[in-house]
């Protein structure tokens, strides 16, 4: 359930919007989230989703979902459907039907013809290599193309023939006629159409020319009546072109949008480059785009992150124009905080040590009911069964305990969570000297009450061996061992492959034992394993006969670089 307190406040974009509404510049807020359907959304997109949809929600406006699909070779319906699912999972709903930039291809073409007629666009025959030479540098002005002064009639004829497929791919482009000496290289006669025979996921084979992003984006905003077009800071240098295109198409003046930029999110210990994420998938460093170690929304969902937790993280990351570098612990902290309130509890033992209760008596030794959550009675309770053999965590026992150790030791006592106080009477070892079993006695007068005359400080979790559910547990950790895996240089000054810094211990699969309540859980069921961490039944692999739990996050932030 959304509420207006869930979104970042007191940032400069909210100030702009409030001033615009107060002055009457806009009667209502209209934003958009415009992903390119060429990959899966990641945590950086989640921040943008929360910003655009959140602002529309806060100010009772609307937010469109628009696919910027101008690059047909890299785009497909798989990504379209995945993006829609991710946005909905985060808790947002777009205005009307999803929109596509390709829905506007006819209008984009007509506007380009209008620019040619106004002498503001021309067909160019320069090759990509020649165009780079003519463009100049940051310190040197560019040169006019020898085709820049073609007549309007010739340009109209050539552009029509480009559309009709009379020229080879890449042989001609349509460029805006702006200023080859402009200090901003983006304004040096940018290309707005290129010839590319490629099947398009939405328009099929209707077109063999496709518009460029910078031309398409601003026009799409205007067509949809977007009031505040929000993008990350790398597009700040593109804003003059955004404005130029809209200023020079009179039909769009009535719905003139404005572009505002904010800093993109850089999350440490991961990467968000689609190219690099794709490399991880292709080279099988991960199991897929939804691998729980990936920073994709689908990966985070499978990891057990909640929409509420991701929205809380986006709020804490904030919106500004300054560098937005955020440690992974901030994301994990937001998820941990949300799950602390929402996740019911179970006990599970990941590294079992057998304990025999020597004075167990059927009929006398009793099970006890325990709440699923200490603060939410509505979640109900369950029986925590006990039997003569139980499992505890191996590291909850120490023969030679360190100072301050409050768990089980030879001759010592400890309370079983939701159960009795037990005392260790005998330690059984194998031939190699490894502890394989403890023999302990139960104090039958301690079920639900403290023992008389002594204090037992330690409390440990456990499961009944007779009743336990055998489960598969995947212990996930950070995918990389360094903060910025894509920005590490070698001795020669060149960047090292980011895959050199993959964490070899980013996933470990073990067999564990859990309370019987774990046997019949549906997929994507989130739980706290008491004293261990938060876990989720795997979205893909979990089943009644093969329970699979993914570790979402530990109870505390104890991560150390390997």
UniProtKB/Swiss-Prot annotation:
One of its GO terms (molecular function) is glutamine-tRNA ligase activity. The keyword Nucleotide-binding applies. GO terms for cellular component: cytosol. It catalyses: tRNA(Gln) + L-glutamine + ATP = L-glutaminyl-tRNA(Gln) + AMP + diphosphate. A motif ('HIGH' region) lies at residues 35-45. It comes from the Bacteria. Gene3D superfamilies: HUPs, Ribosomal Protein L25, Chain P. Belongs to the class-I aminoacyl-tRNA synthetase family. This is Glutamine--tRNA ligase. It comes from Neisseria gonorrhoeae (strain ATCC 700825 / FA 1090). The gene is glnS.
